[in-house]
């Protein structure tokens, strides 16, 4: 199948969702050679991925993943693609604790850094969390605390079959896009940041095919793969099976804008301090961007009607100490179990 897929893509023909799923199944079962995987990655990147192809690949990766069971009917993830190369602190991971502090179930999917100094896993490790906690501990944490961290390598073992080809080719490919679409807990409400504006609709349509309930796929005009407080943000919102795209203006939501340097992060130690400061109630642009991204997640989860009430709820999660309590509880639980 992969040979047929390569030939079709080289001719600039798109694969159907079913065809892509079959190709990825071959790759993730170890049946494709490194040369075939490399050729496939390069050809697809040159042609450009479609949302059907993205959904087909994600569907296979979900099927191959180790799964955890979460009883909540609403499960939020704030995992994005990464790769914006903006050097910010870990906004979406910090926002996840704010969301959990509002009583919404969060299954945060993530990994170590690929292109930045500090990925979500690097941050949480610096905050004291045990990354290699068994799946059952993560499952229990989500059930008891309301938040857990799903460290991607522990759940997506089938990706090892593409690892060597990805390393040897060394360019961004469809594999870099799949993380936010393959949450092992089956998250159905998402805020998903992407590294390029043309990806917002593509990811939103892929989430629609994959059965997501509601999602905000976002890219700031300043290049941020989050909802930005420095510039308008392009949003493709999935709701009720329909996708609409529009711009969010931070000054209309918060009454102010920030400068990009205000959101700068650093290594895991630096970012851990920033996260603790924000969750501890520090005021400023870092708090603003976390609150805005958490607010979108609360709307996606149905925990708020619109941004004004969602922003208030997010601020109360921080100021009432609930957000940092969730962080401390998760760190403690992963180390004691």
From Swiss-Prot:
Mg(2+) 2 binds at residues 225-226. One of its GO terms (molecular function) is anthranilate phosphoribosyltransferase activity. Its EC number is 2.4.2.18. Anthranilate 1 binds at residues 80, 111. Keywords: Amino-acid biosynthesis, Aromatic amino acid biosynthesis, Glycosyltransferase, Magnesium, Metal-binding, Transferase, Tryptophan biosynthesis. One of its GO terms (cellular component) is cytosol. Pathway: Amino-acid biosynthesis; L-tryptophan biosynthesis; L-tryptophan from chorismate: step 2/5. It catalyses: N-(5-phospho-beta-D-ribosyl)anthranilate + diphosphate = 5-phospho-alpha-D-ribose 1-diphosphate + anthranilate. 5-phospho-alpha-D-ribose 1-diphosphate binds at residues 80, 83-84, 88, 90-93, 108-116, 120. Homodimer. Catalyzes the transfer of the phosphoribosyl group of 5-phosphorylribose-1-pyrophosphate (PRPP) to anthranilate to yield N-(5'-phosphoribosyl)-anthranilate (PRA). This is Anthranilate phosphoribosyltransferase.
């Amino acid at each position: 199948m992969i040979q047929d897929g390569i030939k079709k893509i080289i001719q600039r023909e798109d694969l159907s969702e079913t065809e892509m799923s079959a190709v990825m199944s071959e790759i993730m079962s170890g049946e494709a050679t490194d040369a075939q995987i490399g050729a496939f990655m390069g050809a697809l990147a040159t042609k450009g991925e479609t949302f059907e192809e993205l959904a087909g690949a994600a569907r296979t990766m979900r099927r191959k993943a180790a799964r955890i069971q979460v009883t909540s009917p609403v499960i939020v993830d704030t995992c994005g693609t990464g790769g914006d190369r903006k050097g910010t602190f870990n906004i979406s991971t910090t926002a996840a604790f704010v969301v959990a502090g509002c009583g919404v179930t969060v299954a945060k999917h993530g990994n170590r850094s690929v292109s930045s100094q500090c990925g979500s896993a690097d941050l949480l490790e610096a905050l004291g969390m045990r990354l290699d906690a068994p799946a059952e501990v993560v499952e229990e944490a989500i059930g008891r605390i309301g938040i857990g961290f799903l460290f991607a390598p522990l759940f997506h073992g089938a990706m090892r079959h593409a690892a060597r080809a990805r390393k040897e080719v060394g360019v961004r490919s469809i594999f870099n896009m799949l993380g936010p679409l393959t949450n092992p807990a089956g998250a159905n409400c998402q805020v998903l940041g992407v590294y390029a504006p043309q990806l917002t609709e593509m990811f939103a349509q892929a989430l629609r095919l994959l059965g997501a309930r509601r999602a905000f796929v976002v890219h700031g005009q300043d290049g941020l793969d989050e909802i930005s407080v420095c510039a308008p943000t392009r949003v493709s919102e999935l709701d009720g099976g329909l996708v609409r795209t529009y711009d969010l203006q931070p000054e209309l939501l918060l009454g102010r804008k920030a400068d990009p340097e205000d959101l700068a992060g650093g290594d895991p130690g630096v970012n851990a301090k920033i996260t603790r400061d924000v969750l501890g109630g520090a005021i400023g642009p870092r708090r603003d961007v976390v609150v805005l991204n958490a607010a979108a997640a609360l709307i996606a989860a149905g925990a708020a009607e619109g941004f004004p009430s969602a922003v208030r709820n997010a601020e109360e999660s921080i100021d009432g100490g609930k957000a940092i309590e969730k962080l401390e509880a998760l760190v403690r639980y992963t180390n004691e179990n």
